[in-house]
């Protein structure tokens, strides 16, 4: 697999787009757009990204003209990216920006909800299976690789008798511990790399 899909490269090459801020890293929050989904479990990636933007005292996310995405500079060399598509098509907003900036998957940090972790737990990894997460599936398809970094925020499995789609669209508090810990994990990834960040976060 290549780091960015052929289709995304073609889109980045021929679509008329203004310059993006120079960046070496992308920090991607996964979720669904719109007030209906704003506070749901499936949107903890958005919540974490918002927390990071506030903590770094950066400008709010704004539309990136010519892309299906919102962006803002999170720190020097770090661009926060949020697809304006629904979760299942997240890669369509992210991959063309990665292609335009020449950013490999190894420097794309994706923050997302994780059913297979207890609520509040955070785990970091590079690559691996998408575990049925449609946002990750879209990113993998559009980037052409699984080798992006993942900040996984535990939301637990639904109780017996409750369907997963209903469960992930239930509301949660924006200040739950997993979101804050995930924001810390992103900062550690950027500053110290994956191994050091895992050592610091996985013991908590």
Swiss-Prot record:
Gene Ontology cellular-component terms listed: cytoplasm
InterPro entries: Pept_tRNA_hydro (IPR001328), Pept_tRNA_hydro_sf (IPR036416)
Residues where tRNA binds: 37, 86, 88, 134
Annotated GO biological process: protein quality control for misfolded or incompletely synthesized proteins; rescue of stalled ribosome
Domain of life: Bacteria
Subcellular location: Cytoplasm
EC number: 3.1.1.29
Catalytic reaction equation(s): an N-acyl-L-alpha-aminoacyl-tRNA + H2O = an N-acyl-L-amino acid + a tRNA + H(+)
Residues flagged as site, Stabilizes the basic form of H active site to accept a proton: 113
Active-site residue numbers: 42 (proton acceptor)
Enzyme class name: hydrolase
Keywords: Cytoplasm, Hydrolase, RNA-binding, tRNA-binding
Positions bearing the site annotation: Discriminates between blocked and unblocked aminoacyl-tRNA: 32
A UniProt-annotated Pfam family: Pept_tRNA_hydro
GO terms, molecular function: peptidyl-tRNA hydrolase activity; tRNA binding
PANTHER family listed in its UniProt record: PEPTIDYL-TRNA HYDROLASE (PTHR17224:SF1)
Function: Hydrolyzes ribosome-free peptidyl-tRNAs (with 1 or more amino acids incorporated), which drop off the ribosome during protein synthesis, or as a result of ribosome stalling. Catalyzes the release of premature peptidyl moieties from peptidyl-tRNA molecules trapped in stalled 50S ribosomal subunits, and thus maintains levels of free tRNAs and 50S ribosomes.
Subunit structure comment from the entry: Monomer.
Family, per entry: Belongs to the PTH family.
Record-given protein name: Peptidyl-tRNA hydrolase 2
Organism: Corynebacterium glutamicum (strain ATCC 13032 / DSM 20300 / JCM 1318 / BCRC 11384 / CCUG 27702 / LMG 3730 / NBRC 12168 / NCIMB 10025 / NRRL B-2784 / 534)
